Regions:
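Catalytic-core regions of glycoside hydrolase
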Residues: 28-65, 109-113, 209-360
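Catalytic cores of secreted or luminal carbohydrate-active enzymes
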Residues: 338-390
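Aromatic-lined substrate-binding rim segments of carbohydrate-active enzymes
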Residues: 66-168, 189, 245-263
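Extracellular/luminal regions of secreted and cell-surface proteins that mediate adhesion/ECM remodeling
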Residues: 376-545
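C-terminal motif of bacterial Sec signal peptides marking the signal peptidase cleavage site
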Residues: 15-18
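Conserved, mostly hydrophobic/aromatic
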Residues: 77, 197, 210, 256, ...
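Bacterial N-terminal signal peptides that target proteins for export
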Residues: 1-8
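Active-site groove signature of glycoside hydrolases
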Residues: 153-186, 193-238
């Protein structure tokens, strides 16, 4: 360790100790010899941040597409993708998947939005009262989306008119479902289809995570089930060839593991796919009837959340949430007991994102406040506390930088995106030099563990991650520059994931202070009047090239 590095580390420690009663309460940069010591203030409100928090859903052809930047928190959309729109016959190539994806996801990169696609076959089964696809809406999700050259389901179930329930006539007590998921060719066909999805989506920068889907209504892995671990919905016990698809867990587990080497794959239930390292989408958060099937089964996965995303949605149209009188997300969050339960589950399960927010009334002040609290809790929240760096470096000589960052959220960021230190023009804030800190893996910036409900904090606090690097600015004129940090989206190498600090520049960078190259150091403080509000910045984007 060189002398400059030792000096910087010692001064950062002394600075933090001297500011112990005000840590995080203000931004300040101090010059100590040839070292700048920076104390930073946390940005306390919630804000939108890449691949975390409230997740949206818009019914294609029904809900109007966004034509403005999402407000206040959206960075991800759920997209239900009909199988037959991506492959209508076996011979259709991956180009059809790409073409339909482009149609459905047009323009999301300009709003810095990511997609969570879920391929599916059936929206609601006819024996549950499902209605067919609207012929006037080519993208309608309703109905049954079997490829034209695949035999659809022929099931013995009968719908009870006007109700979401079905029955079997006595003569059909052992009658299996024919065709569809149970067709002899289905396993081979679905394996080939998943391979095409991987070819289309595994390197698509628009895709955040991939929900496995395909099986069951909405692709939620029930009706029929993946395994017999849990009783079926429609019958008191499992019946071979009707209530679950024997062996499909291995077929789909192998297919998705092979097709997706880059994107994280999520499945519906924690008790299925035991031999695979998948994330989970639990679509019934905070419902009493799902405590064992959902919540406790997910807890049993242990540290799975450290490498795989945990998400889902809040659904208030059934179970305890409905019986309590909840008819919208606002009702759920404005009920203090329900809000506390959701927050506790987010923290204990290390939740990355939740849906159910699309139609919310953001003018409701209490709802906005509580939605913000959950936004802060979900996913990653990287807070810089202090930093130290070389104040003045001779031309062609290294600048040493070190800083500390803590993840006060509930989950990691799941992809190892580049962490960049840059030098900016002090007037325009344009980047004039950049260095990617290769040794850093931001997926290892982990949150705390073991949530204490009464203390409102993790019993094992999140560790402070100490980062240091040296870089030599090339071809820079002598002068003053702003030294800044940012986490880049590899799609365009533009700032994307943001630090939760008040010292923020429009465009995604976090300025630490001034640094001098080939000149004597002066006042390192950046005027706080230059700082922008994190939540109000609508300039972030990525590229598809």
């Amino acid at each position: 360790m060189n002398r400059l590095r030792i000096v910087v580390m010692s001064l950062v420690l002394l600075f933090a100790m001297s500011c112990g009663n005000r840590t995080g309460e203000s931004y300040e940069a101090r010059l100590r010899g040839n070292v700048v010591l920076v104390q930073m203030e946390e940005y306390h409100p919630a804000f939108r941040n890449t691949m975390k928090g409230w997740r949206e859903f818009f019914a294609p052809g029904i809900d109007p597409k966004r034509d403005i930047y999402p407000y206040p928190y959206g960075t991800m959309n759920k997209e239900y993708m009909q199988w037959n729109m991506m492959e209508n016959v076996k011979s259709d190539g991956v180009d059809k998947v790409i073409s339909y994806s482009n149609h459905r996801w047009e323009g999301v990169e300009d709003m810095n939005m990511k997609i969570i696609p879920r391929a599916f076959l059936v929206w609601i089964e006819p024996w549950h009262g499902g209605k067919p696809k609207n012929p006037d809406n080519p993208d309608d999700l309703n109905g049954w989306h079997w490829p034209s050259d695949m035999q659809p389901e022929d099931a013995p179930y009968k719908n009870v008119p006007g109700e979401w329930t079905c029955y079997l006539e006595k003569k059909d007590s052992l009658t299996p479902i024919r065709g569809g998921y149970f067709a002899p060719e289905f396993n081979e066909r679905v394996t080939a289809f998943v391979k095409k999805l991987g070819q289309a989506w595994d390197n698509d920068p628009r895709v955040a995570f991939v929900e496995m889907g395909i099986i069951g209504e909405w692709g939620e892995h029930h009706d029929p089930d993946i395994t017999t671990f849990w009783p079926p919905h429609d019958e008191p016990e499992h019946v071979y060839g009707r209530t679950w698809i024997d062996g499909i867990d291995k077929v789909l587990g192998d297919a998705f593991s092979e097709a997706f080497k880059n994107k994280k794959v999520m499945v519906r239930y924690a008790y299925d796919f035991k031999d695979y390292d998948f994330g989970i989408y639990w679509d019934s958060w905070a419902i009493d009837e799902e405590v064992e099937r959902g919540y406790r089964q997910m807890l049993s996965l242990g540290d799975r959340w450290k490498t795989q995303p945990i998400g889902g949605e809040i659904t208030w149209n059934w179970g305890s949430l409905y019986l309590q009188g909840n008819r919208c997300l606002e009702d759920c969050l404005k009920n203090e007991k329900t809000f506390d339960l959701i927050l506790e589950q987010i923290r204990n399960l290390h939740c990355n994102h939740l849906g159910g927010v699309t139609w919310a009334d953001w003018s409701d002040s209490l709802f906005l406040e509580r939605a913000g609290e959950l936004q802060k809790a979900m996913g990653h929240r990287f807070v810089l506390s202090e930093a130290g760096y070389t104040a003045s470096a001779k031309v062609g000589k290294p600048i040493h930088l070190e800083f500390a960052v803590t993840n006060t959220g509930s989950s990691p960021f799941y992809y190892s995106w580049p962490l960049e230190v840059s030098l900016l023009d002090p007037e325009t804030h344009d980047k004039v030099y950049a260095h990617v800190i290769e040794e850093v893996d931001i997926t290892q910036w982990l949150p705390g563990e073991e949530w204490d409900v009464h203390a409102g904090a993790y019993r094992k606090p999140a560790p402070a991650n100490k980062i240091s690097c040296d870089f030599i600015p090339d071809n820079l004129k002598p002068g003053r520059y702003v030294i800044a940090l940012s986490i880049l989206d590899p799609a365009g190498m533009l700032p994307s994931v943001r630090f939760a600090n008040t010292n923020y520049f429009t465009g995604g960078r976090t300025p630490l202070g001034y640094v001098w190259v080939g000149e004597k150091a002066g006042d390192p403080n950046v005027d706080i009047a230059q700082f922008a509000d994190l939540q109000n910045d609508t300039t972030l984007k990525y590229t598809l090239e």
